[in-house]
Regions:
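Short phosphate-binding/catalytic loops that engage adenosine nucleotides
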Residues: 40, 501, 884
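Short beta->alpha connector loops at strand-helix junctions that form conserved
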Residues: 46, 484-486, 505-508, 596, ...
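Long, charged amphipathic helices and adjacent flexible linkers at domain junctions
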Residues: 70-73, 238, 400-452, 458-461, ...
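Glycine-rich phosphate/ribose-binding loops and adjacent secondary-structure elements
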Residues: 365-367, 461, 468-476, 480, ...
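Nucleotide/phosphate-binding sheet-loop regions of phosphoryl- and nucleotidyl-transfer enzymes
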Residues: 1-424, 458-461, 468-473, 479, ...
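C-terminal accessory/binding modules appended to enzymatic or scaffolding proteins
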Residues: 14-22, 434-477, 843-859
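Short mixed-charge
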Residues: 77-89, 519-522, 729, 761-770
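Conserved alpha/beta-domain cores
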Residues: 99-100, 553, 563-909
Length: 909
């Protein structure tokens, strides 16, 4: 191990580190150093660097202790010098805290130990020095309990068991006939310490360590060890924090909030973390230590008078009771409060962000223990950024970068009422496929969702094992969708996001019985008509009806979007199949439609009947008769899209799915189709069997359909061109792009383009008029990417269909990946779900290669993506660096993509 500096001291307005050293000192250590340097009262201490955490896992506990010992002993002497106390001394013992601190905030995920250095001699010395034996023994029992849990592993043996120390405390309170910990006497606390030690001896076979240095090394190594505990690992996964970052450890002289009625501890925020309101707020406890505030053992009180009054009103507590039982810190300690208010304002002005601060008041003296940029909701994030911009605290670029694109989701969808959700019964959990909140009666079939809405005006929750395009109308009419199978990019998930519809997919615990129309899950039975609620942001499914409220899009949101548009280079379009989708996307700032899936148009009303006539036709003439019925319908649909986009580009993808998706596969559905079509059932059965494929995703679909049945391409091309000309004739500008799907060979595209061009020329001749249009292709077959130079000879634009391109490049089925994806993620084989976050090293390199080769042949070639990755922030950033012109995503992801595009441009500068 290299001879480098591993320990950095701070105290008395001096520090060896500073706020810019987050990677080395962690967020806590860096900010403690910085607070010292700007004159904030901070107890002295030292920080062991994050690099030591990596060394701990590489070389082990003993090697790290041996390596650290000289620097730590020297740093401890610095604390002793500044405090006038000595670590391990019997007369003036120095007590310290040991805390974690990664470079990214991970509140509550790792371990903390307070009052370290306590033993049988130190407790008597503290009691004598302070004249407060109860405080001394209370601090001792807290230390034994914390150390026992964190370092010695004295935790419940099973989820049914209680904390062994809490059991002992409850027994002591019961024995004494008291309710609160604060009611225990000094003698009671002495007895608790004896009983705690006995419990440690019984469970571990060892005496509780009395040597302060042994205690310290045990605590330091335990904090390093907590970097890899289950909750820390999960938190890192959820927040994309790399495991290799490690945590720092900060050792700090103790200050005590539990010395009596003139002492306290608390947590505060410089602004409201839930709403973003510019209101100093927080909670505190008299005669307590920091862990008490977050543990919920006692009811904390509000810091400010205004906050206290708001809290009391919400709790239906009278002003008299509030003032006498729950007074604010502002009322109880006005001088200390004034200093705290000045410090929080100073810190916010200094760090230029909303601050989360921890403090302790020891015998009337205020000490700051931590400050960090506070966690906040999506709504608060936007409001705080825009407010600080207006206040002149930050500039436009900082305001944009301060807002996380993914958190905008919280602003765009309905949300559950916070009070209602706390009392809701969770029955299972799936994947949070599409954000939002939905509640309604259960139905199992798409047509029943339609009937429920038509007959009662109530939207239902559509519950399916999995969905298909045939369920589209039911999905549209449902309040939300719940599926037992499918991942984040399954049909249900993709379509739901496009609709802005709440969806929970892949809830594998569900036992769905279509015959009895019931769900069995975790001991609950839910019948058709019973109410359930879905949380599309967490994947949780609740029994019964949970109250929801509409998302509130304030003026701050619009201002943020304007700023995003100002700085972004990458354009953002929407995947939209209907004028309603297009209008929604346009409202969110989409600059065109990057993908219109024409097949979705065929499932509404009588359209499916005409399309099935085409499928059943025995020859081309029969197919053309059926297609003639579809022509005016398609033309009308396209007119609506062109009008909604008002001159922005509209990319229409020609028919893509295999024909088997348009026919029923169950006996009941086939009989119904035979009756509606007035043909023998056997003909339906035979046609369905003839359309079946072993691997339809790689089968007779996309351009292969258009090349074998060119009349389909002719009809769609005519509908598109005629619609564009009709809309332009009404005074609305149009920008038409026709996209051929699933091209793997430039000859396939050349054949399709020939059909499109000849059809367009025919329409131009009939109308004695012309209109500009472009023909391009969807790059979703790997061969298309590597032969992009040949394809660019024909294509006027590329749109990367990253859903299928990911499937074909990785060899993963997006509908079946759920069977092994969790294992691959756990083992580190995959870092992310490749259908959610673009595989930049594999699929991404194909995209780069295709763009390079395509523009080598056609320099002004327009390139974009239209897969679900188009709304994922890191994938959008990749698209910016890869030189794409636009991304296209679901309407409700448009704001996220716009903000991500602005981030990419600003980071590049």
């Amino acid at each position: 191990m290299a001879d480098v500096k591993r320990v950095y001291t701070f105290g008395n307005k001096e520090a060896e580190g500073n706020g810019k050293m987050r990677e080395l000192l962690g967020g806590k250590g860096a900010n403690l150093a910085e607070m010292n340097l700007i004159g904030i009262p901070v107890p002295p201490g030292f920080t062991i660097t994050t690099e030591v955490c990596s060394e701990y896992y590489a070389h082990g506990k003993d090697a790290v202790i041996q390596m650290l010992r000289p620097e730590v002993e020297k740093a401890m002497k610095n604390i002793e010098k500044l405090t006038g106390m000595k670590f391990g001394d019997k007369e003036m013992p120095l007590l310290v805290s040991v805390r974690s601190g990664a470079r990214a905030s991970m509140p509550g995920m790792m371990d903390t130990i307070l009052n370290l250095g306590m033993n049988d001699q130190a407790v008597e010395a503290v009691a004598k020095r302070t004249g407060n034996p109860r405080f001394a023994w209370d601090s001792y029992r807290r230390f034994v309990q914390m150390y026992g849990v964190v370092v010695l592993g004295m935790k419940p043996e099973s989820k049914e068991d209680h904390d062994p120390f809490e059991v002992i405390i409850e027994e002591q309170k019961h024995k004494r006939g008291v309710k609160n910990d604060t009611d225990l006497t000094t003698d009671d606390l002495k007895e608790l310490v004896r009983n705690f030690k006995a419990a440690v001896k019984k469970q571990t076979g060892e005496d509780f360590p009395a040597c302060p240095w042994d205690q310290l090394w045990g605590a330091v190594c335990a904090v390093f060890g907590s970097w890899m505990n289950d909750r820390a690992i999960l938190y890192r996964k959820l927040n994309n924090i790399p495991a290799e970052w490690g945590t720092a450890v900060t050792v700090q002289a103790m200050v005590f909030g539990n010395m009596g009625s003139n002492s306290a501890t608390g947590v505060a925020f410089s602004r409201d973390a839930a709403t973003g309101e510019n209101l100093f707020n927080g909670e505190y406890l008299i005669n307590a230590q920091g862990e008490d505030v977050v543990a919920g053992i006692r009811t904390p009180q509000q810091i400010t008078l205004e906050g206290s009054k708001r809290w009391a009103a919400a709790q239906n507590i009278s002003e008299e009771d509030r003032r006498t039982k729950y007074p604010s810190l502002e009322e109880v300690m006005p001088v200390v409060y004034k200093e705290l208010d000045e410090i929080q304002h100073h810190l916010e002005q200094y760090f230029k962000d909303m601050q989360d601060i921890e403090f302790t008041i020891q015998d009337g003296k205020l000490w700051m223990l931590q400050c960090r940029n506070g966690k906040r909701t999506g709504a608060a994030m936007v409001k705080i950024a825009m407010d600080m911009l207006r206040e002149g605290l930050i500039d436009e670029r900082t305001a944009v970068l301060r807002c996380e694109p993914a958190k905008l989701d919280e602003l765009l969808h309905p949300v559950f009422d916070k009070k209602a959700i706390t009392n809701a019964q969770v029955i299972t959990k799936g994947l949070p496929a599409s954000p939002g909140a939905a509640t309604g009666p259960v139905v199992f079939f798409a047509e029943d969702a339609e009937k429920t809405l038509a007959q009662t005006g109530q939207k239902a929750i559509l519950v399916r094992i999995e969905t298909s395009p045939e369920d589209l109308k039911g999905m549209l009419d449902a309040a939300g969708i719940l599926t037992a199978r499918g991942g984040m990019t399954s049909h249900a998930a993709v379509v739901a996001r496009g609709m802005g519809k709440c969806c929970v997919s892949g809830a594998g615990e569900l036992e769905i019985d279509y015959k009895t129309r019931t769900i069995k899950v975790n001991g609950f039975t839910v019948k058709e008509g019973d109410w359930i609620s879905l949380n599309g942001s967490t994947g949780e499914v609740y029994l019964g009806q949970v109250a929801t409220m509409a998302a509130d899009l304030s003026g701050d949101f619009g201002q943020l979007m304007d700023l995003a548009g100002k700085y972004a280079v990458l354009k953002v379009r929407a995947n939209a199949d209907t004028p309603k989708d297009a209008a929604q996307a346009f409202g969110f700032g989409a600059e065109g439609i990057g993908l219109c899936r024409t097949e979705h148009m065929f499932f509404e009303g009588d359209r499916i009947k005409a399309f099935r006539e085409m499928i059943l036709a025995d020859d081309e003439a029969g197919r053309r008769v059926a297609l003639a019925k579809l022509l005016p319908i398609q033309r009308s649909d396209f007119e609506g899209l062109f009008k909604a986009m008002n001159g922005f580009p509209v990319t229409v993808r020609l028919l893509d799915p295999p024909l088997h998706e348009f026919v029923p596969h169950d006996e009941k559905g086939q009989k119904e189709m035979a009756r509606e079509m007035n043909v023998p059932l056997q003909k339906i059965v035979a046609k369905v069997e003839s359309l079946a494929e072993f691997n339809p995703m790689l089968g007779h679909r996309g351009c292969r359909l258009g090349n074998t049945y060119p009349e389909i391409t002719e009809m769609q091309a005519r509908a598109i061109i005629e619609a564009a000309m009709n809309v332009r004739a009404q005074g609305t500008p149009v920008h038409v792009e026709i996209m051929v799907p699933l091209v793997g060979n430039h000859k396939e595209l050349r054949y399709q383009k020939g059909i499109i061009d000849s059809t367009a020329e025919q329409v131009f001749s009939e109308r004695n008029d012309k209109i500009d249009y472009m023909v391009g292709t969807m790059i979703e077959v790997p061969r298309a990417a590597v032969t992009a130079n040949q394809i660019a000879e024909v294509a006027e634009f590329f749109s990367f269909g990253t859903n299928d391109l990911t499937q074909m490049t990785l060899g993963f089925s997006r509908d079946d990946i759920g069977k092994f994806l969790p294992i691959y993620l756990d083992k580190g084989i995959l870092k992310n779900d490749p259908f959610q976050i673009l595989d930049q090293n594999g699929v991404g390199q194909l995209i780069r290669e295709a763009v390079f080769k395509g523009r080598g042949k056609r320099p002004m070639l327009k390139c974009g993506i239209c897969g679900e990755h188009g709304g994922e922030p890191t994938s959008v950033e990749f698209c910016h660096y890869a030189g794409l012109n636009y991304v296209s995503c679901s309407p409700f992801r448009v704001p996220i993509a716009r903000l991500a595009a602005a981030h990419a441009a600003l980071k590049e500068k």
